Amino acid sequence: MTFEEAINSIKELNIETMQKAQKRLDNLTKPLGSLGRLEEIVKQLAGITGELFPCVKNKKIVIMCADNGVVEEGVSSCPKSVTSSVTQNFLKGFTGVNVLSRHSRADIVVVDVGVDDDIDCPGVINRKIRKGTWNIMKGPAMTRNEAIKAIETGIEIVGKLKEKGVNLLGTGEMGVGNTTTSSAVASVLIGNDIGEMVGKGAGLTQKGLINKIEIIKNAIDINKPNPSDPIDVLAKVGGFDIAALTGCFLGAAAYRLPVMIDGFISATAALAAIKIKPECRNYILPSHGSAEPGNKKIMEALDMSPMLLLEMRLGEGSGAALAFHIIDAAVAAYNEMGTFGDAKIEQYKPLE
């Protein structure tokens, strides 16, 4: 499915199924609305899938991995080589997202869309667009065509997972320097001051943070991304990982799959996807409130509330893996609770 085909495939939620789901929720043995946001989650899943009893047993977290040329400006406390190392470590099973996803009965899908290394690791899907983006302090991160190619990579990966019966997606990433590119993209798309968006990432000093803010400001001045054109923003100050995750969100909406935001980087991709196609928002669920300040600004801009507030800033899809437990609980309660008829109890009626 091409970028244009995906955009044209995104439709509104199935309102009829959502109404039926609400009717069932109101008939479960509990006070009306007493499961709070769990009820909203189930209704959203019903609207996305068109199924009155949605299934979320086949879960995958897609991790897009890429390097960023801006790292040469000293915006990260980690060397660029960490991107390649962690990308390969995902397949060894001992990273944070590995552990958390195992406990939520989810698998990870690792995609190399731009790691600056020749990765020969069984299990890493090679969709390398280029070995890292260009330095945004010297010009655009990528060409417009490369940005679209990265987006289409995300769409492609989601389509293949849909064919395999996956029914719940999480999003994750790995890329040294990607909080810098995310801050740049998000600040342009939202219109916020850079200082409100930028955090310390993987552990910058205060001096490093000040440098990071200046680098982002200068990169935006140099490249002049168009806030009304999300693809232009991704191409000029983004990264291959962000663009590919943007494709994951668009692809999920096109294939009618529920998809979860992880932290700041994937929230930036979700923001870009929604700016491209506003209806995409209906298919997206937030997971946790990242400790990165820009994440809160994105959640506010999208009018979303994270399910979990744990001060995490790991990335990788770790927050999505944790929030899968909430989704499982919501679906289990909805599917397995008895009705008032089962319990021979008079149904609650709304108070006037």
From Swiss-Prot:
The keyword rRNA-binding is assigned to this record: no
Swiss-Prot/TrEMBL keywords: Cobalamin biosynthesis, Glycosyltransferase, Transferase
Keyword Transferase belongs to the record: yes
Catalysed transformations (reactions): 5,6-dimethylbenzimidazole + nicotinate beta-D-ribonucleotide = alpha-ribazole 5'-phosphate + nicotinate + H(+)
EC number of this enzyme: 2.4.2.21
An individual GO BP term: cobalamin biosynthetic process
Database matches in CDD domains: DMB-PRT_CobT
Enzyme class, first EC level, given as a word: transferase
Listed InterPro entries: Nict_dMeBzImd_PRibTrfase, Nict_dMeBzImd_PRibTrfase_bact, Nict_dMeBzImd_PRibTrfase_N, Nict_dMeBzImd_PRibTrfase_sf
Pathway membership, UniProt: Nucleoside biosynthesis; alpha-ribazole biosynthesis; alpha-ribazole from 5,6-dimethylbenzimidazole: step 1/2
HAMAP family, A to Z: CobT (MF_00230)
PANTHER family registered for this protein in UniProt: NICOTINATE-NUCLEOTIDE--DIMETHYLBENZIMIDAZOLE PHOSPHORIBOSYLTRANSFERASE (PTHR43463:SF1)
Protein name (record): Nicotinate-nucleotide--dimethylbenzimidazole phosphoribosyltransferase
Species in which this protein is naturally found: Ruminiclostridium cellulolyticum (strain ATCC 35319 / DSM 5812 / JCM 6584 / H10) (Clostridium cellulolyticum)
